[in-house]
Amino acid sequence: MQATPPPVTATLVPETQPQAEHRIGIRLVNDQAEFFDKHSGEKFTPRGANYVFVPENGAFTNTPLRVGTYDPQLTRQVFSHLKGLGYNSVRVFLDSCSRGPNCIANVTKPGLNPAYLDNIADMMLAAREAGIYILFTSNDLPDDGGYSAEANLGSGGDFAGYRNSFYLRPQAISATRRYWRDILTGLVERNAAFEVVLGWQLLNEQWMFRDQPPLSLTNGLVETTTGSYDMGDPQQKQKMVSDGIIYYIAQMKAEILRHDPTALVTMGFFVPELVAPDWYVETSSLLEKSDLDFFDFHAYPGDLSLQAHVEAFGMLGYTAKPIILGEYGAFRHLYAERDTAARVITNWVADSCELGFDGWLYWSYYPANAWIGDRTWGLVDGNDDFLELFSPHNQPDICVPVEIPHANLAYNKPVRASRSLPDEPARFAVDDDPVTQWGAGDAPVQWIAIDLEGSYRITEIRLLVAQWPAGKTVHRVQVRYAGAEGFATVHEFSGMTGDQDWLVFAPPEALENVIEIRIQTISSPSWVAWKEIQVKGESAP
């Protein structure tokens, strides 16, 4: 008797759906590149935030996609909240969690962590549900999964490991292509919502080490993916990096388009002189020659002006491809007061419009932890203060600064001085920006005077010191009353002062009918300068 075969058990295999076309594209309008919505035909302006920190155990973590940390409900709440205020984009790091069993790559074998890919796919679904677009960025090759190990094979000697190898050597190109291939095929298998991807960012910030080989070499020939270069020739060394990065971009873009044919590809850059002079970045040749669809430049208010950033990037007058300001924000150690930070941010963005930027992603939605030295104001600090203030609903045109209420009677008032350096004009003392300063460019005696453009009852005068070296100083606070010919001295500061000190004069009784303030420095070991002069009070009756 023939045995009856066991019943066949059907195995359910998820059906892979046709891949959706990316909704955001790029077009040229009157020789000016711009993003646009392929469905509506309307111009698209990226406005949103870096979604890089999330709450965890009473603090914040920078691994929002980590298995065990990723919160589908929180992600949907945040994306919906952003959309409700008119924002349309977020920037998310794919691999800030790069080492460990709950991170992007497998620990014990090559490839990526399936559970982590599930989280990426769910975030894309959340974005589709909310109507938000995601710019996914890679910080680096993961430590696990075999990617970094392959990229570093054969490094040493003419090539230091890590970044100086990652962008110039064939093993690294192969490893990085495999990384992007694994990400994209994994998301295709999960029927991910590719249409919500604004772009794939090859690197959060591209840079190399000046003080490591091959950039540190002063002689000899070096072989890279793009040829042989003489390290004794600075121009060949620069060409080596430019050629190498252009080739790297072309290779990664080709890999991405194999699996995601309508994708946009970008890369992030910053000006290294701000934080790391030994890091090398050059973008002018990439603007001209690379296959990137758009560029992401990062610039924060501080010691370096936005104009200086733009000149360093080589983007003045550039219109061939869109450029977004993918990171900007106000550092709390520089801008400790909320209103000052808000004013600096809104003016920084307005200036960026004039200099050629086409999109804006604030750093960051949630703040970094309080112990992080260079943290910025988060959009949700306070009671979502900046999130609402800078939202498209409150500020439809990001190029028009938001009006920030202030109590400083000296803010942006006419000012004159005994003398001023060309790059430290007197107006910098009343711009409500503690990073800029008026500088006389000479020793005492020097003065600066502010026309209040009205008659006021003055209750407080505050001076933010710009001084090096520290030492004993004498400063006279003088006022001119309505109807008076000259100035009257109402207070004298005398004592030890140093840079960033605040000198505060609060008269026992308000000074009535004041129309002008003058600060006269009598003695100082430093050239005379002030970062800020603030005047508090009210209109005279």
Predicted features along the sequence, with ranges:
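Active-site mouth of glycoside hydrolases
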Residues: R23-L292, P301-L304, Y328, R332-E337, ...
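Disordered, acidic Ser/Thr/Pro-rich linker "stalks" and the adjacent N-terminal cap
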Residues: P401-S455, L464-T473, E492-D499, E532-P541
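Short, surface-exposed beta-strand/strand-loop-strand elements in extracellular ectodomains
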Residues: G471-A484
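Surface-exposed loop/edge segments in extracytoplasmic proteins
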Residues: E485-E492
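Short, surface-exposed tryptophan/glycine-enriched loops
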Residues: D501-I515
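Short beta-strand-plus-loop segments that form exposed binding edges in beta-rich domains
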Residues: I519-S526
